[in-house]
């Protein structure tokens, strides 16, 4: 019996102001857990898979039911402990402590290999939590849209005089994260050709408005890119195919995209990447019966994929790894120069991290989109001079379809996050919003992750692999009063390659919530400034000084 499969269930988060838990502080994680498994949100909800290969919300359906039951009975001074998607304990703590503590996929470093994880996973002892899947704060593809948009805009600024009109981006992968790419590209003014091997993913992105259209062939897709470039219009096109075949074919034809990247689930060579020449049915069958053969075939295919990206890079085309660890997989298979093109964080995003700026997000527990529109207006009111952010919010309202509970992603940093959180809390208190707001972020943030092939690649002081920082981030968020805190391993780039922490906090309109919000939403981004200042980045040191951070090691 497969305890992870239930084709009969359809999970959706409750809407409205009536709650089934004892307070909003426990109703919030309950709704966000359920929201992660909404069919409009999750990639494979019947298997508890939210996104990112096999990133799950709960270990199995029995664990899901027990988590739900535990949250519904949890008292205001109790904390639920969740070990890799299974509820293992309820303890007496205090009202300002987190209501839920989550640890996912963590393995002692010597044993932190994909093989060992897969063995534990098969035994039912662990699950893969990705980043926001197992920490219950995934909001659909919107969760990464702005970060991807900001990256594309920065590429345009650096390489194309700030104008991406008439340019097109080649990429692959339209899953939960990669599915944000087409919309981010067109928002930035560029066209996109996105290769995807699974028809259901193309269909979902078309249905949710993240993708404009599908091409029937590579020739048609290229014709659409040429037409868009000629007319300087922005269009996103999905192409059913395998990137390991399409990318090299484009090199062979001499096709020159303007930007090249990739968001296939290469971090998981068994469950996330279709080997070259294989059918989906063959892949599905052999993942269970011959996982090592699948892994070998997938990683061999990645070599050709990455070599094509290297070829584009050699042509002078801006080419970037978007954090799926595909370069490492290719290098493991003997492609020595796989890292010759950069990752997106050191190339384009790190200056934001130095100022504690990252993917701040919130969701309306009421389920009413008007609550999000009202908070959008509040953000504009509080940050009147940030025209770039205003433009983003306007585009987001116009072009992003909500998946599950209405939510918003908005990159802001130290000094602004706590102000927004307090303002949202006041709106709840005054009855301007129909229910409380949950505020969280991706684990991809300035101070919450150690990932040498992504967020902490090429750190100035060589501290790429130091993972004390996400541990300290999680501990500080617990001490500060976050509503739930998570500590994960392997998100984004796969098992063995990252450690990262998440936090979520509820704005329920109370004075107690205001005190917690002020602490958490200051301290959380401040750890990012601290981490980058400690590594010697002048922007971070300046930000720390400007905000009065007390960093003893940098005292002059």
From Swiss-Prot:
It is an enzyme of class 4 (lyase). SUPFAM superfamilies: Urocanase (SSF111326). One of its GO terms (cellular component) is cytoplasm. Pathway: Amino-acid degradation; L-histidine degradation into L-glutamate; N-formimidoyl-L-glutamate from L-histidine: step 2/3. Keywords: Cytoplasm, Histidine metabolism, Lyase, NAD. It is found in: Cytoplasm. NAD(+) binds at residues 52-53, 130, 176-178, 196, 201, 242-243, 263-267, 273-274, 322, 492. GO terms for molecular function: urocanate hydratase activity. Pfam families: Urocanase (PF01175), Urocanase_C (PF17392), Urocanase_N (PF17391). Binds 1 NAD(+) per subunit. It catalyses: 4-imidazolone-5-propanoate = trans-urocanate + H2O. Its cofactor is NAD(+). NCBIfam families: hutU, PRK05414.1. Catalyzes the conversion of urocanate to 4-imidazolone-5-propionate. Belongs to the urocanase family. This is Urocanate hydratase.
């Amino acid at each position: 019996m497969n305890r992870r499969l239930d084709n009969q269930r359809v999970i959706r988060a409750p809407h409205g102001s009536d709650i089934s838990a004892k307070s909003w502080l426990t109703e919030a994680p309950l709704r966000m857990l359920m929201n992660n498994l909404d069919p409009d949100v999750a990639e494979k909800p019947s298997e508890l898979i939210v996104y990112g290969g096999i990133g799950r919300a709960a270990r199995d359906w029995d664990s899901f039911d027990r988590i739900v039951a535990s949250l519904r009975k949890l008292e205001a001074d109790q904390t639920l402990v969740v070990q890799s998607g299974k509820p293992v304990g309820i303890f007496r703590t205090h009202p300002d402590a987190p209501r839920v503590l989550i640890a996912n996929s963590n393995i002692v470093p010597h044993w932190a290999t994909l093989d060992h994880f897969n063995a534990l996973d098969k035994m039912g002892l662990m699950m893969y939590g990705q980043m926001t899947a197992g920490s219950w704060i995934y909001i659909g593809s919107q969760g990464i849209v702005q970060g991807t948009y900001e990256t594309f805009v920065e590429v345009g600024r650096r390489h194309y005089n700030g104008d991406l009109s008439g340019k097109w981006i080649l990429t692959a992968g339209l899953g939960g994260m990669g599915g944000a790419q087409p919309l981010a590209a067109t928002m930035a003014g560029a066209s996109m050709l996105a290769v995807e091997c699974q028809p259901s993913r193309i269909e979902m992105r078309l249905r949710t408005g993240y993708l404009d259209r599908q091409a029937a062939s590579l020739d048609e897709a290229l014709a659409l890119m040429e037409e868009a470039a000629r007319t300087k219009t922005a269009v996103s096109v999905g192409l059913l195919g395998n990137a390991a075949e399409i990318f090299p074919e484009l090199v062979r034809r001499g096709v020159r995209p303007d930007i090249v990247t990739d968001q296939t689930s290469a971090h998981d060579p068994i469950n996330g990447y279709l080997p070259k020449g294989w059918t989906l049915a063959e892949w599905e069958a052999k993942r269970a019966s011959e996982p090592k053969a699948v892994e070998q075939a997938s990683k061999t295919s990645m070599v050709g994929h990455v070599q094509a990206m290297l070829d584009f890079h050699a042509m002078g085309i801006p080419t970037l790894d978007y954090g799926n660890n595909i370069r490492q997989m290719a290098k493991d298979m003997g492609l020595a120069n796989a890292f010759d093109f950069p990752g997106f964080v050191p190339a384009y995003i790190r200056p934001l991290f130095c100022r504690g700026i990252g993917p701040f997000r919130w969701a309306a527990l009421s389920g009413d989109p008007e609550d999000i529109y009202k908070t959008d207006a509040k953000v504009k009111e509080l940050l009147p001079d940030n025209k770039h952010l205003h433009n983003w919010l306007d585009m987001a309202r116009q072009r992003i379809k909500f998946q599950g509970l209405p939510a918003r992603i908005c990159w802001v940093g130290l000094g602004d996050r706590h102000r927004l959180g307090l303002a949202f809390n006041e709106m709840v208190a005054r009855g301007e919003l129909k229910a409380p707001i949950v505020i969280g972020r991706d684990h991809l943030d300035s101070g919450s992750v150690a990932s040498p092939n992504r967020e902490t690649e090429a750190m100035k002081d060589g501290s790429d692999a130091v993972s004390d920082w996400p541990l300290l981030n999680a501990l500080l968020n617990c001490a500060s009063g976050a509503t739930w805190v998570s500590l994960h391993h392997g998100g984004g780039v796969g098992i063995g390659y990252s450690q990262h922490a998440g936090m979520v906090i509820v704005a329920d309109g109370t004075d107690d919530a205001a005190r917690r919000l002020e602490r958490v939403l200051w301290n959380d981004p401040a750890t990012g400034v601290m981490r980058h200042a400690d590594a010697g980045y002048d922007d971070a040191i300046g930000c720390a000084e400007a905000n009065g951070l007390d960093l003893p090691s940098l005292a002059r």
